[in-house]
Amino acid sequence: GCFALTEPGAGSDVLAASTKAELNEEKTHYILNGQKIYITNGSWADVIVVFAMVKNKYTAFIVEKDFEGYVIGSEEKKLGIKGSSTATLFFENCKVPVENVLGEVGQGGPIAFNVLYPGRYKLGVTTCAGAKYLIKGALDFAFEREQFSRSISNFDMVKNKFANMVAKSWESDSVNYMTTGAIDQAISKLDKNDDNFYAGVQKIIEDHSIESSIAKVLGSETLAYTVDEGVQVMGGAGFIEDYPMAGAYRDERINRIFEGTNEINRMIIGGYVLKKSIL
C-alpha cells in the first residue's frame, strides 16, 4: 500500500490540498480529481490511502489500483533511496465507492497526522541505528588505514571526530529509548479486550507526538553528521561507490525532508513548549 498525501501546492501545509472529491448523483461513489506527488511505493501499491477535499472537508479515501480513473505516473529519478518506488499519482474522475471513505468525511486531518506521528518516531530510531552502523564502518577503516607509519585512528583529529559522532548517537538513542519506554508503559495500562483499545493506542501516540518530532530531528541530523564525518575519515575512499559511505551519503538526505521537514518539526516542538511552558 501507499500513503498519498503530498501535492504540488500542499507539501508541509497538507491541509491546503486541491484534490477534490464530489459525490455523484446516485450517491454511490465519490469522484476524485487531482494529483499526488512524491508518493513512496506509488508504482507498486495495490491499495492507496488518498486525501481529498469534500466540500472543504479534508477526507481520507481507500483507493484500489484497478479503480477507474486512477493513473500512475512515471518513476521519479531520485538522489538516493533508489530501491524505493516514488511516483506521481493522478485521479481523473476516479470512482471511489462511498463505503471506501476512511473514517468519516472531514476526519482526514487526524488520520493523516496519526500516520505521521509514529512515522517520525520510527524514523528517529532507524536513522540512529544507521548512524551507529556507519560509525562502525568508519572505525574499521580508521584502524586499517595507515599514514605517516601509523594507524589514522591514533590521530587526535580523528579521535575528536569519533567522539562527536558517538556523543550525538547516544543523544539520539537516549531520546528513542525514553520515548519507546513512555509509549510502551502507557499502552501496557490499556485493556486489550476493551473495544476502545486501539482508540486508546491512537490517543497515546498523539500524546507523544512531540517526543516523536524530537526523535526524528535528532536522529536524522545525527545520521547526516555521521555520514559526512564518515566520508571525511575515509578520505578519497569515502567518495568511491565501492565503499559504504557514498550510498549512505545520498540516502541520508531525504530523512530531513520526509515525515515532515525538520523545520516543520522544530516549529511543532517550539510551539508546544511555548504553549505549555514546560519541558
Predicted regions: what they are:
Residues 16, 68-97:
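Flexible, small-/acidic-enriched active-site or ligand-binding loops
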Residues 9-12, 38-41, 53, 78-85:
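Short Gly/Pro-enriched turn/cap motifs at secondary-structure boundaries
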Residues 1-6:
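A short, Trp-centered hydrophobic/proline-enriched beta-strand micro-motif
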Residues 88-90, 115-279:
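Alpha-helical interface subdomain recognition
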